[in-house]
């Protein structure tokens, strides 16, 4: 599903009500195949690219530094804009301002940085008072004959015990062994941390078991002048680190419509949930919270479902896979959690429009960290792929260590 705004770094039975929710196959942004008209209930939102226009385009690569960065709306006004530049595992806010008429945001300094990833999160109100959110990313030009690594997690962050160190390279790596030898991941207290390649442009690191709470992890990139491919050399020589916070592992039972939340091994709560409907089941397996968004737009077209739904203000969204699985608040099917699975593959918790810390979704969001583990069992789908998000915990240790390029 489509995610947008407010990255928070700190994540079958027939139902009879005013509406027949059993007719609703509510996707990661629940909408129905049985005739339920969410457009009528929620108000028809404009298409994401029409409601909030962002340049450079979402997903852009090798964007040149002279390209103009703008956030614009055709009507109504921009409510909030946050732009972040990420380099060497460090996030830097990009200062800027919204124009007096509320229609345009532009940065204080026009020139984009080289070899950086930019993230744009924007929220706007249209002329009818409907709120929309949009999230886009793009990467800027890396000089010819150089490569860099985009790093997860963020430097100096506090993360959950399931965090996997993930390096995404700007160019395909031919000499994987040379690059692997140039990356050093160490922990205090000491633990064996091993690498695994997913294709030619991604290298992940993890221990055999989840990190112990309190572990301090250091990552050193000694990539400068390392030849990753013929004539292509590394640009970075950086060190960054993160700290593992408390342990929180949540078990979603899709058949029971429940989620058990365990903090440091003790049961904290059992929360009612709604998982993927029979036609769109939720992945089984271990998933790691990759991002946390206070509000997001979820649009079925972004994940191959056609025009089945488009909800502009999904609250408390926690990204679990790169393909678009989220755990999020659900205010449009309030009777579903604990009773029936109605989504297009996400896990939904009861919430209210606009989100509230007093709802199950808000309660869970406020107690979660990026890097927390959410495991799904008893769904009708396959196990999530290990390279879909931070899914590497679904490989056993022998499978994981076999992914090293160094003998």
Feature locations, PLM:
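Acidic, low-complexity Ser/Thr/Gly/Pro-rich repeat segments typical of extracellular/periplasmic
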Residues: 2-25, 29-246, 273, 404
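Soluble periplasmic/extracytoplasmic beta-strand elements of cell-envelope proteins
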Residues: 53, 70-72, 119, 166-168, ...
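Extracytoplasmic/periplasmic, Sec-exported soluble proteins
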Residues: 61, 110-113, 157, 161, ...
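Short, charged beta-turn/beta-strand-edge "cap" motif at the junction between a beta-strand
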Residues: 124-126, 223-225, 265, 295, ...
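Exported/periplasmic cell-wall-interacting domains
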Residues: 161, 300-407
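Gly/Pro-biased beta-strand-loop elements
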Residues: 231-338
């Amino acid at each position: 599903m489509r995610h947008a705004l407010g990255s928070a770094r700190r994540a079958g039975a027939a139902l009879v009500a005013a509406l027949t929710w059993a007719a609703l196959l509510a996707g990661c942004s629940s909408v129905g195949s049985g005739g339920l008209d969410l457009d009528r209930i929620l108000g028809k939102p404009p298409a994401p690219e029409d409601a909030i226009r962002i340049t450079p385009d979402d997903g852009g690569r090798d964007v040149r530094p002279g390209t103009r960065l703008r956030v614009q709306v055709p009507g109504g006004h921009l409510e909030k804009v946050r732009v972040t530049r990420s380099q060497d595992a460090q996030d830097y806010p990009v200062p800027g301002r919204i124009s007096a008429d509320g229609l345009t945001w532009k940065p204080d300094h026009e020139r984009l940085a080289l070899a950086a990833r930019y993230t744009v999160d924007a929220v706007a109100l249209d002329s009818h008072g409907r709120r929309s959110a949009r999230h886009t990313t793009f990467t800027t030009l890396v000089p010819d004959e150089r490569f860099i690594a985009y790093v997860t997690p963020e430097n100096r962050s506090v993360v959950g015990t399931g965090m996997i160190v993930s390096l995404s390279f700007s160019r395909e790596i031919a000499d994987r062994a040379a690059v692997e030898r140039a990356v050093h991941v160490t922990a205090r207290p000491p633990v064996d941390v091993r690498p695994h390649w997913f294709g030619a442009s991604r290298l992940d690191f993890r221990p055999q078991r989840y990190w112990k709470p309190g572990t301090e992890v250091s990552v050193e990139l000694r990539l400068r002048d390392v030849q990753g491919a013929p004539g292509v050399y590394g640009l970075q020589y950086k060190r960054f680190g993160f700290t593992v916070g408390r342990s929180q592992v949540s078990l979603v039972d899709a058949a029971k419509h429940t989620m058990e939340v365990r903090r440091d091994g003790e049961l904290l709560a059992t929360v009612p949930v709604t998982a993927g409907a029979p036609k769109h089941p939720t992945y089984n397996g271990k998933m790691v919270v990759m991002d946390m968004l206070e509000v997001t737009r979820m649009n079925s077209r972004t994940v191959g479902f056609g025009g089945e739904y488009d909800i502009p203000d999904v609250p408390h969204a926690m990204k679990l896979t790169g393909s678009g699985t989220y755990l999020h608040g659900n205010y449009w099917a309030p009777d579903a959690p604990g009773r029936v699975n109605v989504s297009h593959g996400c896990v939904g918790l009861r919430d209210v429009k606009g989100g509230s810390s007093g709802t199950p979704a808000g309660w869970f969001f406020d107690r979660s960290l990026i890097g927390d583990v959410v495991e799904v069992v008893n769904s009708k789908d396959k196990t999530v792929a290990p390279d879909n998000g931070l899914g590497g915990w679904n490989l056993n240790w022998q499978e994981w260590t076999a992914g090293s390029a160094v003998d």
